[in-house]
Amino acid sequence: MQRDTQVFDLIAKEKERQLNGLELIASENFVSEAVLEAAGSVLTNKYAEGYPGKRYYGGCEVVDQVEQLAIDRLKELFNAEYANVQPHSGSQANTAVFHTVMKPGDKFLGFDLSHGGHLTHGSPVNFSGKLYNPVFYGVDKETGLIDYDAVAEIAEKEKPKMIIAGASAYSREIDYKRFREIADSVGAILVADMAHPAGLIAKGLISDPLPHCHIVTSTTHKTLRGPRGGIILMGKDFENPFGEKLKNGNLKKMSTMLNSGIFPGNQGGPLEHIIAAKAIAFGEALTDEFLHYTVQVKKNAEKLAQAFVEKDYKVISGGTDNHMMLIDLRNKNVSGKEAEEALSKADITVNKNMVPFDDKSPFVTSGIRIGTPAVTTRGLQENDMNKIVDLIDRVITNIENDTELEAVKKEVNSMMSGRPLFVA
């Protein structure tokens, strides 16, 4: 069959874009050649509905071993008793948890999207806000930090069945112990969504949700530096508190219910080529090299945030404890949309993002979200962060000056020239 040059030419263009630019989107990263190889392997040919040893198709002897290896490595990485590696995405993992814990119309408490939460934490345009009854907590207007006393007050008033601790645009440590105390006080299931900082959590660099939360979900890309996908974890399995029973009359374990929440609850056959790529990424994450990488991600983020503050940019909460930061551009009289578009012309990729108490729409926004996982994978270190902020500042202050944007682009291209996508 003739090679599809139209598609492969586009893939080549995308590779050039990634090689030439500064990738500062906090949710993006670059995977190893081994992860890429597994994701493009013959495992994509195999259907495997069910779980290892309990499939609805024949010929699963090898993919059973692949999936079990991914499960075992993931358990070791997070010291977890239970792991499911089948979710196609973090959103699918969250969907399975909702299906397992909640019934349509049940109330839950999530992080307000405009304050740093995620679509699946109760946005009205998402299944979580359409099928269920969300109430929200947020951050303090002055500090930009989660107000745990306010969370406790809302929980006491609303009595949610489930509380979600986690964010897509929050740069500080999350106090999972305090969240568990709040959840226990109202009899709620506590779910952590650690999609963003999972790699840092795995190496002990920031607080670990598994000892405190009933259920933990994550993506496998971002700071875990694996293929695009999702996972579900529990530090300890436990009998479900909803009275769901097996045929023998015993209470079902939450692991059984979560597995059913994924298959057949909201997915069919798992993507075994992606699960193989996950297994490789988990293996990489178990190494000392990955520890060195995550330490550098955190150092780079701290330095980047500091450099923004020194340039009179407002960093929400004043800094970062993880891999990302949220920049409020209102004192620069530039919208997030304008900044994203101008930076893109200079081969600097960020995403526009609402800031807490934003007065602009989600399509415009007052801020940008920036992260260091991808540039750290390419080998950049603290001494490169001031240069990055200088380049961003030149774009922000010359947003309609195409000549200056082109000059910045040339400097970006020179800065990244000769650097492979995967160094660290």
UniProtKB/Swiss-Prot annotation:
Chief place where the protein resides: cytoplasm
Protein's pathway: One-carbon metabolism; tetrahydrofolate interconversion; Amino-acid biosynthesis; glycine biosynthesis; glycine from L-serine: step 1/1
Any Pfam family the entry gives: SHMT
UniProt keyword annotation of rRNA-binding present: no
Binding-site residues for (6S)-5,6,7,8-tetrahydrofolate, renumbered to this chain: 113, 117-119, 361-363
Swiss-Prot/TrEMBL keywords: Amino-acid biosynthesis, Cytoplasm, One-carbon metabolism, Pyridoxal phosphate, Transferase
EC number: 2.1.2.1
Entry-linked PROSITE patterns: SHMT
A GO cellular component entry from the record: cytosol
Keyword Hydrolase in annotation: no
Modified-residue entries (N6-(pyridoxal phosphate)lysine), positions: 222
Site features described as Plays an important role in substrate specificity, chain residue numbers: 221
An annotated GO BP: tetrahydrofolate interconversion
Single GO MF annotation: pyridoxal phosphate binding
Reaction equation(s) it catalyzes: (6R)-5,10-methylene-5,6,7,8-tetrahydrofolate + glycine + H2O = (6S)-5,6,7,8-tetrahydrofolate + L-serine
EC top class named in words: transferase
Cofactor(s) this protein requires: pyridoxal 5'-phosphate
Task performed by this protein: Catalyzes the reversible interconversion of serine and glycine with tetrahydrofolate (THF) serving as the one-carbon carrier. This reaction serves as the major source of one-carbon groups required for the biosynthesis of purines, thymidylate, methionine, and other important biomolecules. Also exhibits THF-independent aldolase activity toward beta-hydroxyamino acids, producing glycine and aldehydes, via a retro-aldol mechanism.
Subunit organization: Homodimer.
Family: Belongs to the SHMT family.
Official protein name in the record: Serine hydroxymethyltransferase
Lineage, top ranks: Bacteria, Pseudomonadati, Bacteroidota, Flavobacteriia, Flavobacteriales
Gene: glyA
